[in-house]
Design a protein with these regions (language model features):
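Short, well-ordered beta-to-alpha junction loops that form the rim of enzyme active sites
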Residues: 13-15, 80
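Short helix/strand-capping connector loops at secondary-structure junctions
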Residues: 77-86
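ATP/Mg2+ or Mg2+-diphosphate-binding catalytic cores
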Residues: 86-108
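Short alpha-helical
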Residues: 52, 82, 93
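Active-site Asp-x-Gly
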Residues: 4-10, 17-73
């Protein structure tokens, strides 16, 4: 984690399947941004939080932004805020996810 030197990128900030769609012409659209400057990996991490996108999305994305070493561990860090937020708002199974994330982070 300490060797990761991300470049600030303007990210969507809430990129999950509920915020993407197709317009009348058949073009893909994204909406409901919560944009901020961050490591581009935060958007990809968010896409994996609630089921993920199709394989082709990731293949095309990683042609532009190749996967960097340690990404799989950073997914947990980048999604921790979102899991805490959902646990605060909805409780339920999100509380167990928070516990699991804490265990994974402590074991890194």
């Amino acid at each position: 984690m300490l060797n990761h030197k991300p470049t600030n990128t303007l990210v969507h900030g809430d990129l999950w399947s509920g915020n993407v769609g197709i317009d009348k012409s058949g073009k893909g659209v994204i909406f409901d941004p919560a944009s901020w400057w961050a490591d581009n990996e935060v958007d990809i991490a968010m896409t994996k939080l609630f089921g993920g996108f199709r394989k082709e999305f990731y293949e095309e994305y990683h042609k532009i932004f190749p996967i960097k070493k340690g990404f799989e561990k950073r997914i947990i860090i980048y999604n921790f805020y979102h899991i805490l937020n959902h646990a605060n708002m909805f409780a339920g199974s999100y509380l167990n996810q928070v516990k699991n994330y804490v265990k994974e982070i402590l074991n890194m």
